[in-house]
């Protein structure tokens, strides 16, 4: 699933080609995504100028003159630029054709993504209750410490809760916990303030590096320019169960936490 760095990589890749451009038309080949694409999306968006391309959590917000297109990539989705009129394959469901002769193409083999229209996107039910962005000053270890008091749930699903902080998915939660030396099974409420301060800094550091590297390519992800992400070359634990720890040489263990596979080092993470 594309996580925050992959979505931010996509945003940075497509924004220069979209901002300031007028939409010529919207071609929808398949409306049945996680939520149906509005039947009047072509009417609402055609003729409008795209004024901004922003991100909130894992949602891309294409701001037009009279509303905003909210897009989510789901489990396997991608947005990339093609020349208008480029033949579409089976899973290429939407083209937003621009006056420049380019088109923003949405591809989603599993159809778990979304394209929705909103006049007030930050008040939309999908966005209004989200926690702070991890790469802003609004997110810090103090917040993790305060929200975790009295919580018995494991720390990994705790930091993956979008009400706590947005955009920390399975890949980057695993890597941040390893970097901070914290066992992902440890109860969130038992972790000290000092360790949360360290964890927050590692979350910020790892997400920033992942964005710089263009995200992590696992199965389907490509950036807005069609290129893969390269952060997978720097993974310490995610997807490496049974392999040797790059730091201490111990065998990495794979467990299930919150219905997700989690890999950790029994020696480095306590």
Swiss-Prot record:
| Residues annotated as transmembrane | none
Give the Pfam families listed for this entry: Fapy_DNA_glyco, H2TH, zf-FPG_IleRS
Cofactor note as given:
Binds 1 zinc ion per subunit.
- Show the catalytic activity: Hydrolysis of DNA containing ring-opened 7-methylguanine residues, releasing 2,6-diamino-4-hydroxy-5-(N-methyl)formamidopyrimidine; 2'-deoxyribonucleotide-(2'-deoxyribose 5'-phosphate)-2'-deoxyribonucleotide-DNA = a 3'-end 2'-deoxyribonucleotide-(2,3-dehydro-2,3-deoxyribose 5'-phosphate)-DNA + a 5'-end 5'-phospho-2'-deoxyribonucleoside-DNA + H(+)
**One Gene Ontology biological process:** base-excision repair
User: What CDD domains does the annotation carry?
Assistant: EcFpg-like_N
First and last residues of each zinc finger (FPG-type): 236-270
Q: Which UniProt keywords apply?
A: DNA damage, DNA repair, DNA-binding, Glycosidase, Hydrolase, Lyase, Metal-binding, Multifunctional enzyme, Zinc, Zinc-finger
Annotated EC: 3.2.2.23, 4.2.99.18
What terms describe the molecular function in GO for this protein?
8-oxo-7,8-dihydroguanine DNA N-glycosylase activity; class I DNA-(apurinic or apyrimidinic site) endonuclease activity; damaged DNA binding; DNA-(apurinic or apyrimidinic site) endonuclease activity; hydrolase activity; zinc ion binding
Active site annotated at which positions?
Answer: 2 (schiff-base intermediate with dna), 3 (proton donor), 58 (proton donor), 260 (proton donor)
Please name the PROSITE patterns in this protein's record. Answer: FPG_CAT (PS51068), ZF_FPG_1 (PS01242), ZF_FPG_2 (PS51066)
Ligand binding (DNA): 91, 110, 151
Q: So which domain of life are we looking at?
A: Bacteria
Q: Which cofactor does it need?
A: Zn(2+)
Per the record, the similarity remark reads:
Belongs to the FPG family.
Q: What does this protein do?
A: Involved in base excision repair of DNA damaged by oxidation or by mutagenic agents. Acts as a DNA glycosylase that recognizes and removes damaged bases. Has a preference for oxidized purines, such as 7,8-dihydro-8-oxoguanine (8-oxoG). Has AP (apurinic/apyrimidinic) lyase activity and introduces nicks in the DNA strand. Cleaves the DNA backbone by beta-delta elimination to generate a single-strand break at the site of the removed base with both 3'- and 5'-phosphates.
Record text on subunit structure and interactions: Monomer.
This protein is called what?
Answer: Formamidopyrimidine-DNA glycosylase
Organism, scientific name: Pseudomonas aeruginosa (strain ATCC 15692 / DSM 22644 / CIP 104116 / JCM 14847 / LMG 12228 / 1C / PRS 101 / PAO1)
